A protein has these predicted regions:
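Intrinsic-disorder/low-complexity regions
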Residues: 1-2, 10, 46, 59, ...
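Short, charged/polar N-terminal "headpieces" of proteins
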Residues: 1-33
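Residue-level marker of intrinsically disordered, low-complexity segments enriched
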Residues: 5-7, 37, 42, 97
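Generic preference for hydrophobic/aromatic residues in regular secondary structure cores
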Residues: 6-9, 46, 54, 105
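Intrinsically disordered, low-complexity segments enriched in small/polar residues
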Residues: 18, 48-52, 99
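Compositionally biased, intrinsically disordered low-complexity regions enriched in proline and serine
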Residues: 21, 53-55, 102
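Acidic, aromatic-enriched beta-alpha/helix-loop junctions
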Residues: 30-74
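Low-complexity intrinsically disordered segments
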Residues: 61-108
Length: 108
């Protein structure tokens, strides 16, 4: 798979939450990065910022492209994983199809 420049999957802002999620493909690897700022995060963890990262290896990135079935992987990612529940949907599709993603996160 060719590299794909970064696309925005979520750019949500409300009084209590800001959520920004992007996806890109580098070296055939799908990378999804998110950053949330919330009052709940500050109350739970002492910091309002929460960052998280998902990645699929090359093989599973290709499998995901086939599963989503769109000619344009960019379009398929936007249609399936946009909005506040996009990362949840990504995890569910991966789990239903045996795709192994890596996940990392941190606060602050």
């Amino acid at each position: 798979m060719n590299d794909m420049s970064r696309i925005v999957l979520c750019n949500f802002k409300s009084q209590n939450l800001q959520c920004y999620v992007t996806a890109e493909v580098k070296g055939g690897i799908l990378l999804i990065s998110g950053q949330d700022f919330s009052i709940a995060g500050e109350q739970l963890f002492g910091d309002s910022e929460y960052e998280y990262f998902y990645s699929l290896n090359k093989e599973d990135t290709e499998k995901l492209k086939t599963i989503l079935g769109e000619r344009s992987f960019r379009k398929a990612l936007k249609e399936n994983f946009s909005g506040l529940d996009g990362c949840k949907t990504f995890r569910e599709i991966c789990e239903m199809n045996g795709l192994r993603y890596e996940f990392n996160s941190y606060c602050g």
